[in-house]
């Protein structure tokens, strides 16, 4: 875990600059003039420090797929769902993982600490589940990822309930 001292931070609740002491990845103290000899130190140079962002509803299995298989010309949800149905049979775990990792790195670099992502479990296979479980493991030191089994085509479709249960057995967190 990370030990760090961040000096000269502007916070929303304090008029004067504050220092932030982080031990084992957890904020242990916020005060003016914290001293520590052996910690890596960052000077925030009187910039504003905010809590991290949380993305509470995302579809990481579809991230960065603009134009695949074609552009959603109407911009509507219905056309987007239709396009997803066209793309889904051609998805691979590697392609989903590559795009999701790229997105996660982008999100972390911009201050996101947690993502709740839906993953479609209504296809013939669970490539999205497989890929996003890998992504969650790969990124666990940088971002918290909660995975939601999402039966896009409905629970009553063939094999969907079985897929849902299998996804939960594989490590998906919740259903939604």
What do the PLM-derived regions correspond to, one by one?
Residues 5, 16, 108-111, 171:
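Short loop/turn motifs at secondary-structure junctions
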Residues 95-106, 156-166:
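Short, acidic/polar
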Residues 9, 25, 46, 57, ...:
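Divalent metal-coordination and catalytic microenvironments
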Residues 64-96, 171-174:
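Active-site gating loops and adjacent loop-to-helix segments of metal-dependent hydrolytic enzymes
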